[in-house]
């Protein structure tokens, strides 16, 4: 709903179902065991916010509050302390997720665009504990430059804040730990070969940052992806 020439209000309410992944159902090796008894996640939630735009429409700033309740939230647990084998499980009761997101989009010139966003999230399970591996702070920022009519390039920086996880010790005890925050930088270039065909190359994790999304499992270092994207 437009409140003013430069201000829009927006809101939504809805429910969603998220089925377990194939990996969660069937596992993928001896250390991640499938769980065929998993139930789908069911959530009910909504958001409300305001979008502010400049007169020329080249810059916008959005602030949104969101909240949802999740039933049967999918998490993981260790089932063998000797091999550290784990499996996906449904959490009991309802989990709560709420937070605020702010986002900026700008067109600096006809060829140069930029964006930035930040999300603050609070999570709690039915017992009041913070959900595992859900960062409170997430941020992204980037630039895209159309060098020529066919050639473009972009740069992106993303920040992931600290997350809670569970440490399983050789003595069969557990305790909560915080995974450290990390920042990644990525570069990309694309070339339009034809109206319906674009070739692209991405250099991800430019500075070869070592990080973990799950305690004990390192993620990819510096890597390159090259591909073709077509439209019909």
Question: Which residues does each PLM region occupy?
Answer:
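Residues on the lipid-exposed face of transmembrane beta-strands in outer-membrane beta-barrel proteins
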Residues: 1-3, 48-52, 102-106, 116, ...
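Membrane-embedded beta-barrel scaffold of Gram-negative outer-membrane proteins
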Residues: 2, 8-14, 18, 40-98, ...
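Repeated loop/turn-to-beta-strand initiation elements of outer-membrane beta-barrel proteins
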Residues: 6-9, 56-61, 110-114, 149-154, ...
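C-terminal beta-signal and adjacent terminal beta-strands/loops
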Residues: 17, 66-71, 76, 114, ...
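Extracellular loop and loop/strand-boundary signature of outer-membrane beta-barrel proteins
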Residues: 30-36, 85-90, 99-101, 124-130, ...
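Residues that define the transmembrane beta-barrel architecture of outer-membrane proteins
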Residues: 42-46, 67, 94-98, 135-139, ...
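Gram-negative outer-membrane beta-barrel transporters
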Residues: 66-69, 87-168, 198, 207
């Amino acid at each position: 709903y437009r409140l003013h020439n430069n201000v829009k209000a927006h809101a939504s309410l809805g429910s969603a179902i998220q089925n377990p992944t194939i990996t969660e159902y069937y596992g993928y090796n001896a250390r991640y065991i499938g769980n065929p008894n998993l139930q789908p996640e069911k959530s009910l939630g909504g958001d409300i916010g305001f979008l502010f735009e400049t007169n020329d429409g080249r810059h916008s700033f959005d602030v949104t509050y969101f909240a949802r309740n999740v039933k049967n939230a999918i998490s993981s647990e260790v089932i063998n302390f000797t091999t550290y084998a784990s499996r996906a499980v449904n959490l009991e009761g309802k989990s709560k997720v709420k937070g605020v997101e702010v986002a900026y989009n700008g067109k600096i010139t006809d060829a140069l665009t930029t964006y930035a966003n930040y999300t603050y999230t609070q999570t709690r399970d039915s017992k009041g504990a913070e959900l595992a591996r859900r960062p409170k702070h997430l941020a992204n920022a980037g630039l895209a430059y159309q060098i020529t009519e066919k050639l473009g390039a972009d740069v992106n920086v993303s920040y992931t804040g600290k997350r809670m996880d569970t440490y399983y010790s050789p003595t069969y005890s557990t305790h909560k730990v915080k995974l450290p925050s990390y920042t990644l930088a990525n570069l990309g270039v694309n070339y339009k070969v034809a109206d319906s065909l674009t070739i692209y190359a991405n250099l991800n994790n430019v500075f070869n940052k070592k990080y973990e999304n799950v305690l004990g499992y390192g993620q990819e270092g510096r890597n390159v992806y090259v591909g073709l994207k077509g439209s019909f």
